[in-house]
């Protein structure tokens, strides 16, 4: 996180992951496959600006990107990439903060996770026990925080 100018904060991160199963007793049939839920590229960017117009107001947002990945050990289930946008505004009083948030601004439908061992099957070669979890829709949140 850095401050390009006073009251403006910007942060970013990115990751590149090149993962694959190696031949082993448990995962021999999947050697060379990508493990489930591992995106090759991920990244985040966020920013906020405070004291807008001299008011105790901070606004900001974030963008998150997750690349395509697989939802199973055999690499038969494709999970599409997705990009999420979140926004917030916070008004700060003497002993309180009032915050409004919008999560998933564009109402993106995506799969954040696949559970390979959903049925608690102990055999790693069992590939049909997947549970695919769908994303939450666009959500609005309002919170109040008090300091006593």
What do these predicted regions represent?
Residues 30-31, 85, 101-103:
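Short, solvent-exposed micro-motifs at the edges of structured domains
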Residues 65-72, 91-148:
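C-terminal beta-signal and adjacent terminal beta-strands/loops
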Residues 33, 37-43, 81-85, 94, ...:
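Residues that define the transmembrane beta-barrel architecture of outer-membrane proteins
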Residues 31-35, 49, 75-77, 88, ...:
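Outer-membrane beta-barrel proteins
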